[in-house]
Amino acid sequence: STQAKTLFPYTTLFRSWLPSFIRSWTPGVYTELYHSLKTGKLVEQRVLSGPFWLNLQNGGTIGSYIEASVQNLEEPFNPVGIRISPGMFKYTRAGFMLENDPSAKYYVSANYEWGGYYNGHLTYMELSSRIAPIPHINLGVSYQQNQFDGVGDLRGKKQVNLIQFDSRFALNPRLQLIGFYQKNTSDALNSLNLRLAWEYQPLSYVYLVFNQSDFMGSDLTKQKVQTFLTKLSYLKQF
């Protein structure tokens, strides 16, 4: 597919009537268009508007948004095991979010969305936090809840909860261990990713990557796959 994006310049407003804890008000509109290379038909269109978007003096953000979507599925789509047959779908969603300064030692954010989703409805909530007590350590945790109602060919209901943990430990800027763990509490499916990155000389790296993930097989039984990857890159500068 081809992709076209349009970002209308966000208007940054500084006004004396804004409360002192608000740095600026930045409303804007963002659009995306995707077309099929085979047929030239529109595959996906998104228009996202953030009329109420406030940047705070402490580096945080409070915002609300509305998103209108058009999805033209050319093949069946199966999010979280829910089958959606090909067709044209139009729906609108709304949401709000708030966060403190992402660069702060302690970071917290919240996001809540509701509205249409293909031929049904989806309510989404995410809470996340991160702590970076020293530059060498970064730890994060998040919780997501997805409630599907009337989505898919069977028009059923399903709730999917995800718990995620991520970490970064750096002995120095050249040697880092990065980890990610996700648990799907609804289907008891887990995934783990560990990556060791070592820059043994400028712009030359050694990567060691371990992946383990659970998935539901075609026979609806829980299955597991493990992979281990190594990568060596070398750059000689003249």
Language-model features and meaning:
Residues 14-238:
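Exposed, low-structure sequence patches enriched in small/polar residues
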Residues 2, 6-13:
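Short, small-residue-biased leader/transition segments that mark boundaries at the very start
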